């Protein structure tokens, strides 16, 4: 046990030596793509890919916490994913129950706070209960915020937010002059989080698939070739190193 702890500490130290500690992205968002293809390549059922993808979430959460990332948002289930086969959807809906049952003690120990964005009231009762239990048990934690985007879609979020803004303006007798970027930000599901500096998508696909479409306007995009179950700690560190090699310009010019 002691040797295992020493090895873990050495690994964390190695990661920290590879990275510029002053330029760790505060918020990383990940589109976890490739579970089904991972399983298909191995002639396994798609649900096996989702199971292995759950193990990857554990690995990435640990290392993100260890290197000082403050927010990690994972695209777990989109509003469009309901169109998948019923058996697959049912399995995915049960994943948070199993994941949080096995991983929650470690999340508590590592001071990780579990949060969600999305229309979670539409999820099965058992899924909602597991999520709410994790939120309650980690509510006072002050470390990494692990944010699951579940039953989430960027366009649906914007429609929902616009309706709320319209109702608020109407009820308070205000006009549209009050609306600016800050006002919109304050009505999004992500209002308590900074925009992601880094968006990673695994599997080699190069699109954002309706994920955080307002929030990633100035994010750095990295499209990693690994399928999500094969994406590991070293791959995350590689992505962060690529991020650190870039200069974020926010529409301006780079320094010469």
Curated annotation (Swiss-Prot):
Which annotated residues bind substrate?
34-38, 46, 50, 78-80, 82, 84, 201, 207-209
Using the record for this protein, list the coiled-coil segments as residue ranges, or answer none.
Answer: none
Q: Name one GO biological process term.
A: polyprenol biosynthetic process
Question: Might you give the EC number(s) for this enzyme?
Answer: 2.5.1.-
For the ligand (Mg(2+)), the binding residues are 33, 220
CDD domains named in the record: Cis_IPPS
- Would I find Metal-binding among this entry's keywords? yes
Q: Which GO terms describe its molecular function?
A: ditrans,polycis-undecaprenyl-diphosphate synthase [(2E,6E)-farnesyl-diphosphate specific] activity; magnesium ion binding; manganese ion binding
Query: PROSITE patterns recorded for this chain?
Result: UPP_SYNTHASE
> Which residues are the active-site ones?
33, 81
Q: How does it assemble?
A: Homodimer.
Family membership: Belongs to the UPP synthase family.
Summary of the function given for this chain in its UniProt record: Catalyzes the condensation of isopentenyl diphosphate (IPP) with allylic pyrophosphates generating different type of terpenoids.
- Protein name per the record: Isoprenyl transferase
- Where does this protein come from, organism-wise? Staphylococcus aureus (strain COL)
Name of the gene encoding the protein in the UniProt record: uppS
């Amino acid at each position: 046990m002691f040797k295992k702890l020493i090895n873990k500490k050495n690994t964390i130290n190695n990661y920290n030596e590879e990275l510029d500690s002053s330029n760790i992205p505060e918020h990383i968002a990940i589109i976890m793509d490739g579970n089904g293809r991972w399983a298909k390549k191995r002639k396994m059922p798609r649900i096996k890919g989702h199971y292995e993808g759950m193990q990857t979430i554990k690995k990435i959460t640990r290392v993100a916490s260890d290197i000082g990332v403050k927010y990690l948002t994972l695209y777990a289930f989109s509003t469009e994913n309901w169109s998948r086969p019923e058996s697959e959807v049912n399995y995915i809906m049960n994943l948070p129950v199993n994941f949080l049952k096995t991983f929650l003690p470690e999340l508590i120990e590592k001071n990780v706070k579990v949060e969600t964005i999305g229309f979670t009231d539409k999820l099965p009762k058992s899924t909602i209960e597991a999520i709410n239990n994790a939120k309650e048990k980690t509510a006072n934690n002050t470390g990494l915020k692990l944010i699951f985007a579940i039953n989430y879609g960027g366009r649906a979020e914007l429609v929902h937010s616009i309706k709320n803004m319209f109702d608020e303006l109407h009820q308070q007798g205000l006009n549209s002059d009050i609306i600016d970027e800050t006002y919109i930000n304050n009505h999004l599901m992500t209002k308590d989080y900074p925009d992601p500096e880094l968006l990673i998508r695994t599997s080699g696909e190069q699109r954002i698939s309706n994920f955080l479409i307002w929030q990633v306007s100035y994010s750095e995009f990295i499209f990693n070739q690994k399928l999500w179950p094969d994406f590991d700690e070293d791959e995350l560190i590689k992505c962060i190193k690529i991020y650190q090699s870039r200069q974020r310009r926010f529409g301006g010019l780079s320094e010469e």
